[in-house]
Regions:
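Metallo-beta-lactamase
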Residues: 45, 136, 143-236, 241, ...
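Short, surface-exposed loop/turn segments at beta-strand-coil junctions that are enriched for proline
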Residues: 593-599
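Asparagine-centered strand-capping/turn motif at beta-strand->loop junctions
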Residues: 550-554, 594
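Short proline/glycine- and polar residue-rich coil/turn motifs
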Residues: 578-586
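Active-site HxH/HxHxD metal-binding segment of metal-dependent hydrolases
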Residues: 27, 52-136, 322-405
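Low-complexity, acidic Ser/Thr/Pro/Gly-rich terminal tails and inter-domain linkers that flank the onset
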Residues: 509-539
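Conserved beta-strand hairpin/beta-sheet module of binuclear metal-dependent hydrolase folds
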Residues: 20-56, 158-172, 176-177, 281-331, ...
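Short acidic, flexible loop segments centered on an aromatic residue
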Residues: 555-569
Length: 628
C-alpha cells in the first residue's frame, strides 16, 4: 500500500481538494461537503464519515456516526470498494431498511405531527457491525470507544481514539467550527418529559444535545473532528461557546413562546431545565389581557363563525366534521341562514380537512391570498407539517391588503407569515362596533407561535413575525386578537408588541452566532431548498418536470446549482445554475425521465444544492411514481 501522504497528494491532484495538515500523527482529514477522516495503522486505513472526493482507492472500515443521507453519501464509494461499515445500533434500521421508511412516508407525510427530518438515507447500507454506548472497537491494535451522543439525530454516536498521544473525538454533527450547529430544524422532536409532541417541540432534542456535549467534554479530547467544518483544536472552548450560544438562543425563544398559554408554566419549565439547567428560570413576557368574544363571533371548536344581522354567516376555517354538524344544527334551529364564504387562515389539516364537506352542505366558497392559495389547491405538491389530503378550489383569490364589504362588516385580508409561511389573517371591522383580527394560530396571549420549525418562520425586517407585528401595530385602536385555539379574545399592549419585536431582533443576532451561514434563516428554515412538486408521476418512456425551489436568505446575490442523484431506473437532468437576488426566490428545473420498460413503483429522487462557498449533498428529495 502506498504511504498515506502520497495517497492524499494523488487525491488532491485529482479532485482539486487539499487535505488539512494532519491534526495528530497517523490521522489525516480531507475536507469537503462532509469531512473524510483517515487513520493509518500498520499499512492499513480506517475511515470516519467516508471519502468526500470519491477517489480514495479504498479503506478497510468506515465508521458512521449517524443516519443522515447528507452525510453517509461520503461512505458510499469506500463501501463499494469493500470497506466494512460500522453504524449506530439505534439508527441501524434507517440505514439497513430505508425502503421501509419511505414506503410508509408516502402516506405519513400527510397529517404529519411527528416532524422527523426527512434527510433519511435512500440507499441501504449493510453494516458489518452495530455499536452502542460503552462498546469498544479493536482495529489494528487501536481501541476505539463508543459514546451515544444523541442530539442532531436521535441515535447518533461519537467515536473516541487515542492517536499519537492525543485523544481524538469524531462527533458527527454534534458541533462544528468554533462552537456552532449546522441547524436547529433537524432537532425538532417530541419532549416526553414535558408531555410535548413532535410538532410542538421547537428544537426538541436540544436537551439531548446539551447532555451529549457534556459527555464529550468529560472525555477531555485534545481534538474534535466533526462531520462538517474545520478540525477543532480547542474542544473545551468550542463546547463552552456552543453551550452558551444554545442557552442564550433558547432563553430568548422561551421568553415569548406561544406554547406557554396552552401548556402552562410547569411544562415549559421542564423543557427549559433540560437545556438551561435545573435552576433555570425564564424571563417571560407578561400575558396579554384577555376579553370575551362579542356576540357576533360564535366559537365552534377551532372555527369561528361571523354572524351578520340577517343570520348570514362567514366561517373562519373548517377542520372537522363536527364543526359542519354544529353549523347544520344552527341552520335547522333558525339561527343560521347560510354560509356563502369561508376564510382560511392557514393550510394545516385541523383548519382545512372538512372544507369539502362544508362546500357540499352549504356551497361555501373558499377565500385566501398569497402563497396559501396554491397550498390549499395542491397540498400534495408540498412537504410541510400537518398537510391535509383534501385539495380545495379557492374561489375568492384576494390580494394582500385587499378590503371588501360583507353585510355590515368591512373585511381586509393580509398575508400573515407567522405560524407558517403560508398563512393569512383577516381584519373584521363591524359598522359602529369593535374590530377583530383573526390571526390564525400565529399568536397567543403569551407570545408568538413558532414552535414547529418546519413551518418556515423567517427572521429579518419585513419578514416572518416582524412583518406580522408590523401589521398588528397598525390595527384599529382596541382591536381584538383571535386565535381559534384560544377561548377568549386578547390584546397586546404597545410595550408587549415592542418586546416581541426586540426579542426577535435579538434572536436574529444570537442565531447568526450559532449557525455557520451568512444568514441565520438557513439554520431555521429547512424549506429554503425543496423539490417541487414533492410527488410526481411519470409513465415509461416519458418525462416530468421538477423544480429545485430555493429561497436565497443571504444578504447578497448568489449562484446556486442543482445536483440530482436519480434512483436506479430513472434519469434526472438539471438546468444550469441560477442567480438569485438577496432574500428572493428562484428555481432550477430538473427533467426526470423513465426509460421505456421502467418498472412501476415509487422511487425517491434526491438532489444536492451548491453555491459559491458551500455544498449540501442529497439535501432534498421528491417521490417519483412510475405508472404502469
Amino acid at each position: 500500500m502506498r504511504p498515506l501522504r502520497s495517497i492524499f497528494l494523488l487525491v488532491a491532484a485529482s479532485c482539486m481538494a487539499v487535505a488539512q495538515e494532519a491534526p495528530v500523527p497517523g490521522l489525516a482529514v480531507l475536507p469537503g461537503a462532509v469531512n473524510g477522516a483517515f487513520i493509518e495503522r500498520n499499512g492499513k486505513l480506517l475511515a470516519v464519515y467516508g471519502d468526500p472526493s470519491g477517489n480514495r482507492p479504498g479503506a478497510g472500515m468506515v465508521l458512521i456516526t449517524h443516519a443522515r443521507r447528507d452525510v453517509v453519501w461520503a461512505a458510499r464509494s469506500l463501501l463499494a470498494k469493500g470497506a466494512k461499515a460500522v453504524v449506530p445500533e439505534k439508527e441501524a434500521d434507517l440505514l439497513v431498511r430505508p425502503e421501509k421508511f419511505w414506503g410508509e412516508f408516502r402516506e405519513k407525510r400527510f397529517h404529519d405531527y411527528a416532524q422527523r427530518s426527512t434527510k433519511v438515507p435512500i440507499e441501504a447500507i449493510r453494516p458489518d457491525r452495530t455499536v452502542k454506548e460503552g462498546d469498544t472497537l479493536e482495529w489494528e491494535g487501536l481501541s476505539i470507544r463508543v459514546l451515544e451522543t444523541p442530539g442532531y439525530t436521535r441515535g447518533a454516536v461519537t467515536y473516541l481514539a487515542d492517536l499519537g498521544g492525543k485523544k481524538v473525538a469524531f462527533t458527527g454533527d454534534l458541533i462544528r467550527d468554533d462552537g456552532k450547529l449546522q441547524d436547529l430544524f433537524s432537532l425538532q422532536d417530541a419532549i416526553p418529559s414535558a408531555r410535548i409532541g413532535g410538532y410542538h417541540g421547537w428544537a426538541g432534542r436540544l436537551g439531548d444535545l446539551v447532555t451529549s456535549l457534556g459527555k464529550v467534554a468529560a472525555e477531555r479530547p485534545d481534538v474534535i473532528v466533526p462531520a462538517r467544518g474545520p478540525v477543532l483544536r480547542d474542544p473545551r472552548a468550542a463546547i463552552d461557546r456552543l453551550l452558551a450560544r444554545i442557552r442564550s438562543a433558547y432563553s430568548n425563544y422561551l421568553s415569548v413562546d406561544a406554547l406557554r398559554w396552552y401548556f402552562k408554566d410547569g411544562h415549559i419549565l421542564v423543557k427549559a431545565q433540560r437545556v438551561l439547567g435545573p435552576d433555570a428560570r425564564v424571563d417571560w413576557m407578561p400575558m396579554a389581557e384577555t376579553l370575551p368574544l362579542p356576540d357576533w363571533i360564535v366559537p365552534i371548536s377551532n372555527s369561528r363563525l361571523l354572524l351578520a344581522a340577517d343570520r348570514s354567516g362567514l366561517l373562519v376555517d373548517c377542520g372537522g366534521a363536527k364543526i359542519v354538524e354544529e353549523l347544520k344544527k344552527m341552520r335547522a334551529g333558525g339561527k343560521l341562514a347560510s354560509i356563502g364564504e369561508v376564510f382560511i387562515t392557514h393550510y394545516h389539516d385541523d383548519h382545512t380537512d372538512a372544507l369539502p364537506l362544508l362546500a357540499k352542505e352549504f356551497g361555501s366558497g373558499v377565500t385566501a391570498c398569497g402563497s396559501l392559495v396554491d397550498v390549499l389547491e395542491r397540498p400534495g405538491d408540498y412537504r410541510l407539517p400537518c398537510l391535509t389530503k383534501n385539495p380545495v378550489a379557492v374561489a375568492g383569490k384576494r390580494r394582500d391588503g385587499e378590503s371588501w364589504r360583507w353585510k355590515e362588516f368591512k373585511l381586509t385580508i393580509h398575508d400573515f407569515p407567522g405560524q407558517t409561511l403560508h398563512h393569512n389573517a383577516l381584519l373584521v371591522e363591524r359598522d359602529g362596533g369593535v374590530a377583530a383580527f383573526f390571526a390564525g394560530d400565529s399568536l397567543t396571549p403569551s407570545g408568538i407561535d413558532d414552535y414547529c420549525l418546519q413551518n418556515r418562520n423567517f427572521l429579518g425586517e419585513g419578514r416572518g413575525f416582524l412583518r406580522c407585528l408590523d401589521i398588528v401595530e397598525k390595527l384599529p385602536a382596541g382591536c381584538l386578537l383571535l386565535n381559534q385555539h384560544v377561548g377568549p379574545a386578547f390584546r397586546f399592549t404597545p410595550e408587549q408588541v415592542a418586546r416581541m419585536r426586540e426579542t426577535i431582533r435579538k434572536r436574529t443576532l444570537l442565531l447568526a452566532d450559532l449557525f455557520p451561514f451568512d444568514a441565520p434563516d438557513y439554520g431555521l428554515d429547512e424549506g429554503w431548498a425543496a423539490l417541487h412538486p414533492y410527488s410526481v408521476a411519470v409513465a415509461p418512456g416519458e418525462s416530468a418536470r421538477l423544480a429545485l425551489r430555493i429561497t436565497n436568505h443571504s444578504p447578497r446575490e448568489r449562484t446556486f446549482r442543482a445536483a440530482p442523484r436519480p434512483p436506479e431506473g430513472l434519469t434526472a437532468v438539471p438546468a444550469g445554475p441560477v442567480r438569485i437576488a438577496a432574500r428572493a426566490d428562484g428555481e432550477i428545473g430538473i427533467t426526470v425521465g423513465a426509460p421505456p420498460g421502467a418498472a412501476p413503483g415509487v422511487r425517491v429522487l434526491a438532489a444536492g444544492v451548491a453555491w459559491e462557498d458551500g455544498e449540501l449533498r442529497e439535501w432534498v428529495e421528491a417521490l417519483v411514481e412510475v405508472r404502469e
